Amino acid sequence: KARRELAQKNRIGTKALNFNYTLASGAQGSLYQQKSDYTLLFINNPGCHACTETIEALKNAPIINQLLEQKRLTVLSIYPDEELDEWRKHLNEFPKEWVNGYDKTFAIKEQQLYDLKAIPTLYLLNKDKTVLLKDAPAQTIEEYLLMKGEQ
């Protein structure tokens, strides 16, 4: 039952649940504060092999870099766990253009705002934070953005 309830959250076509995050500088932000046409929410753990592969795939996707440059896409990378020293150690692996934050209050995990059964997880959201793609691989996100004629 709990599994099903979690799967019901943040479905495609629904508004993604808001949460707050903290940057390495201590500055705070929230998902809903992102102003770009698209927000790519990337929930990940430092040092996880699949996370590193996803970072590389996103870094090497021309459409993603182009939209980042045009300020039409925000990549919001969020660390949902407690090991902040570990997170800080890996910060330099993320592109500077991304917003790299952590969930200081562990709300994502404790309130089960997002399904974290698989890490990393990617959500593509539109300007209104409606979920366009959920749990999608980087390639699917790239193809979606290209298909939308966002070149």
Q: What feature does the model see in each segment?
A:
Residues 1-20, 32-36, 85, 89:
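N-proximal helix/coil linker or "cap" segments that precede and/or mark the start of modular domains
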Residues 23-27:
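Extended, helix-rich structural scaffolds rather than catalytic motifs
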Residues 52-92, 106-112:
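Structural microenvironment flanking redox-active thiols in thiol-disulfide oxidoreductases
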Residues 118-121, 127-151:
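Non-catalytic, surface beta->alpha helical segment in thiol-disulfide oxidoreductase systems
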